[in-house]
Amino acid sequence: ELSNSLINAVYQDRKGFIWIATENGLNKFDGTRFSIYRHNATDSTSLKNNYVRTLFEDSRGNFWIGCINGLQRYDRATDNFHELFISRKDGRKNPHITSIIERRNGDLWIATSGQGAISLKKNSNPASFHIETELTDRIGSNYLNVIFEDSRQNLWIATEEKGLYRYSPESKELKSYKAPYHIAGDDV
């Protein structure tokens, strides 16, 4: 049985497990039964928060979990979660993760609600996050819902109130797509 009926994401990993992100825990279905992962305040290797927003497995087999207060990586060998700390110069940390992608070049890009876009260069060890301040300043919003890379390696960024953007990380070109006057808003 699922931990909650409010589902934010469903994801199948390369081993065939179905993962379900809910607003009250993370569920893993092995084809027969569900395992439920929840936050445990006395266990630093438990799920960081029960409100799980997004799930993603990268090309190296790392399984990422985005919660409303940070990013974790799941360790299959130990069945534990490890937090990756993301800090900004202004002292803010533990962003609300809304979307995670891997670009064709192997870099991870992370959309957040409140702290803009974050990138993680492929093979950076230890994990070195780059807050994409210039990009979010140009967009005019730190509230990003979804990030997607197209076949031309452009990033498409859907915001909560500023519409849709196409961004080329290489050329830094940014194109805005706003709602026509007869649509109620630019929440994408």
Locate each region found by the language model.
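Carboxylate-rich, polar loop motifs that coordinate divalent cations or form catalytic acidic clusters
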Residues: 1-188
